From Swiss-Prot:
SMART domains given in the database record: SR
Signal peptide positions (record): 1-30
KW Transport (keyword) present: no
One cellular component term from this protein's GO annotations in UniProt: membrane
Protein source organism: Strongylocentrotus purpuratus
Alphabetical list of PROSITE patterns matching this protein: SRCR_1, SRCR_2
Topological type in the membrane: Single-pass type I membrane protein
Protein name per its UniProtKB record: Egg peptide speract receptor
Record's keyword terms, sorted: Disulfide bond, Glycoprotein, Membrane, Receptor, Repeat, Signal, Transmembrane, Transmembrane helix
Chain positions carrying an annotated carbohydrate: N78, N115, N459
Family annotation (SUPFAM superfamilies): SRCR-like
TM segment ranges: 492-520
Ranges per topology, Extracellular: 31-491
Pfam families: SRCR
Length: 532
């Protein structure tokens, strides 16, 4: 039995609307194709995270096809971006930076002068030789946003992305920086601002890479080297009011140290010592999900960034250090606290995640010699390391490796508390160097407990004591120890395990849920922050 004619017409109309709607949402999602209509010679960017970046495709013979990265350079990128309506290019990319998604290639050996209005007007080898290129050689660009921030930087005329003549954006125009007094601190700030966390490798003068075609904007830039942005540097000469010759012979160039897998940087903080943690992986900066993120992870990040340690690892709100379009690279980082680089830690989920950017991990690193803050560690463990049962060197863990105790005021009060936790009735302190304190091995500790203060009352726990934790590894008085007697059961909720040592002796380890406040003191290294 058929449907009434009117109902059939409604059904066909509904189907038509649905089909049109489906066809209009082509490429919606994480990998959008930003570009122009399918007209001969038009171009588009695909697989970028924003509309101003991606692999370059050109429309020819009724099909979109890629551009091979042979001869691909900054002038090609500038023409590409200007054709798409952007002010110019910030960066050019080779080797399928945005992924090996392009399967058909129309153009190779593209070589623009920079004054062309369309990419097809540039010199290139004839269309239609797709077998000469493959998906790993797709050319890409990052275009300057249409509303470029004051003081933005870019490099032009270099053969590789991390070098070139330095240009800055000021009052609506791109122009050069005069090389007067431009040194390593200035280059470090410039390179880090442009995404190269390791800073500058070398400074090039006298227009080494070629000359800017814009005005000469900055002269006598004077940075300390710790600034996050060149606009934070001292500028004794007003922009555009330079004392350089009115030619570009003094244009400064930079060679930035290329990023290395596992490099880290801190973004959008009030200074270089704090911010959202980003890690360099697979040739791109990305964030880390804060699932499982703790003080041990933050401590490794801060040391890798050139600081002594972290003063804050959690309790951030998503908006504290802003949001980013960068990918989320990983989650559940598991550090012991002694690693030199974050990439040396265990990545429980590998390079995968199931997070959103509101969960990006952040840190605040120590900056001053007298930085004193309060943290609340999740778990504190104490162990006695020696050749005999119940006697030896005292070591403490805050979840980031084991630390030695250096305390000139070490007394029987503290020893009694430690022994009580280890399951003994009594305890006596021992000074460094005494026979009872000798341990079977040395300890490479990431920190030193440079003070434990207990009252010595009956059944006192470590959560009732105060600790000062220092990343300064010097200890004039030597490690402290204890001699415990009167073995008994450990306090409720704690356990002891012999994890090493000779017969009749060993290392007694116990887990202590210590929700005390610990006063953390860090010492700033020579030279301040910044990644080595």
């Amino acid at each position: 039995m058929g449907l009434p004619m009117m109902l059939q017409q409604y059904c066909w109309a509904a189907c038509l609307v649905i089909c049109i709607a489906i066809s209009s949402v082509d490429d919606v999602g994480a990998e959008q194709n930003y570009g122009r209509e399918a007209v001969e010679g038009n171009i588009r960017l695909i697989h970028g995270r924003t509309e101003n970046e991606g692999s370059v495709e050109i429309y020819h013979a009724t099909r979109w096809g890629g551009v091979c990265d042979w001869w691909w350079h900054m002038e090609n990128a500038n023409v590409t971006c200007k054709q798409l309506g952007f002010p110019g290019a910030r960066q050019f990319y080779r080797r399928a930076y945005f992924g090996a998604h392009v399967t058909t290639f129309w153009v190779y050996k593209m070589n623009c002068l920079g004054n062309e209005t369309r990419l097809e007007d540039c010199y290139h080898r004839p269309y239609g030789r797709p077998w000469l290129c493959n998906a790993q050689w797709a050319a890409g660009v990052e275009c300057l946003p249409k509303d470029e921030p004051q003081g933005s930087l870019r490099m032009i005329l270099g053969d590789v992305p991390n070098e070139g003549t330095l240009e800055t954006f000021w009052d609506g125009a791109w122009g050069s920086v005069c090389h007067t007094d431009f040194g390593t601190p200035d280059g470090n700030v410039a390179c880090r601002q442009m995404g190269y966390s390791r800073g500058v490798k070398s400074i090039k003068t006298d227009g080494h890479f070629g000359f800017s075609t814009g005005p000469i904007i900055l002269d006598a830039v004077d940075c300390e080297g710790t600034e996050a942005h060149i606009t934070e540097c001292n500028m004794p000469v007003t922009p555009y009011q330079h004392a350089c010759p009115y030619t570009h012979n003094w244009d400064v160039g930079v060679v930035c140290k290329p990023n290395v897998e596992g490099d880290i940087r801190l973004m959008d903080g009030s200074g270089p010592h704090e911010g959202r943690v980003e890690i360099w992986h697979d040739d791109a900066w990305g964030t880390i999900c804060d699932d499982g993120w703790d003080w041990a992870d933050a401590n490794v990040v801060c040391r890798q960034a050139g600081y002594r340690g972290a003063v804050k690892a959690s309790g951030f709100k998503g908006e504290d250090f802003g949001f980013t379009w960068a990918p989320i690279h990983t989650s559940f980082v598991m550090c012991t606290g002694v690693e030199d680089r974050l990439i040396d830690c265990i990545l429980r989920d590998g390079w995968t995640h199931s997070c959103y950017h509101v969960e990006d991990a952040s840190v605040v690193c120590a900056t001053d010699d007298d930085d004193t803050i309060e943290i609340e560690p999740k778990h504190t463990r104490v162990r006695i390391v020696g050749m005999g049962q119940g006697q030896g060197r005292v070591e403490v863990s805050l979840g980031n490796g084991w630390g030695r105790v250096c305390d000139p005021d070490w007394s029987d009060h503290e020893a009694k508390t430690v022994c009580y936790h280890a399951g003994y009735k009594w305890g006596a302190s021992r000074a460094a160097g005494s026979a009872e304190v000798s341990a079977p091995f040395d300890l490479e500790a990431p920190f030193i407990i440079d003070g434990i203060t207990c009252s010595g009352v009956e059944n006192e726990t470590l959560s009732q004591c105060q600790m000062k934790v220092s990343a300064d590894m010097t200890c004039a008085t030597g490690d402290v120890g204890v001699v415990c007697e009167g073995s008994t059961a450990p306090p409720s909720g704690m356990s002891i395990a012999v994890i090493g040592g000779a017969a009749g002796g060993g290392v007694a380890g116990l887990a202590v849920a210590a929700f005390a406040f610990y006063y953390i003191k860090f010492v700033k290294p020579a030279g301040g922050g910044g990644q080595a």
